[in-house]
Amino acid sequence: MNEYFVNLNIKEMPETMRPREKLIARGEDKLDEAELLAIVLGSGTREMNALELARQLLARHGGSLRFLMSATLEELTAEKGIGMAKAVSIKAAIEMGRRVVGNIQLRRIIKSPEDVQEAVRELAMEEMRHYDREHFRVLYLDRKGGLITMQDISIGGLHSSIVHPREVFKTAVKKSAASMILVHNHPSGDPTPSQEDIEITRRLIEAGKIMGIEILDHVIIGEINYCSLKARGLI
């Protein structure tokens, strides 16, 4: 961004550099991450406009929107220039995007191992690969393989927050699910399963056999790719 425009109000900038006007004229896909974030923020501070605030916020986190996916309100408001109103707007925008994707994908039918991996790629990969903490998510399916719902069971890591069968199967029973797909991410970016990943999966599979609920796969998501424990022959 040209330093000449740093301390200007957005309205004082040339129209071609204003995020909202650029979106209207050229389309949302022509905006970079900072410009999109500036629109969500709505306004800047006394020291900088919304676009510069967005650029500085991203710069503090490696230039990526990744941290916004799992940031709490407390973490957002700890950032310079981000008050509660801006933090709430960010959280609402992230959640709205998540729900749009979720509503589309809930129509999916999953019947084969290939369907499982495709569903994980399209439903969870893009979102979960950006998380900086481990999220353990479960996709619940009906008897025909239809996706009923999905739910994050644990946040914080399999090591610090052990996944208990009770939490995993509570929603399955409530929703009358016939099978499940387990998904979690590795913030390190390497989807290689740990021994603990394998042991937890096998423990959940045994619990599922008792309850008559099949676990179809456990997919671990990394930064670039993913690992299916089923495809690896680990379960």
Curated annotation (Swiss-Prot):
It comes from the Bacteria. Keywords: Hydrolase, Metal-binding, Metalloprotease, Protease, Zinc. Zn(2+) binds at H184, H186, D197. The keyword Protease applies. Residues 109-235 form the MPN domain. GO terms for molecular function: metal ion binding; metallopeptidase activity. InterPro entries: MPN (IPR037518), RadC_JAB (IPR025657), RuvA_2-like (IPR010994), UPF0758 (IPR001405), UPF0758_CS (IPR020891), UPF0758_N (IPR046778). Pfam families: RadC (PF04002), UPF0758_N (PF20582). The keyword Translocase does not apply. GO terms for biological process: proteolysis. A motif (JAMM motif) lies at residues 184-197. PANTHER family: DNA REPAIR PROTEIN RADC, UPF0758 PROTEIN YEES-RELATED. Belongs to the UPF0758 family. NCBIfam families: PRK00024.1, radc. This is UPF0758 protein Swol_1642. It comes from Syntrophomonas wolfei subsp. wolfei (strain DSM 2245B / Goettingen).
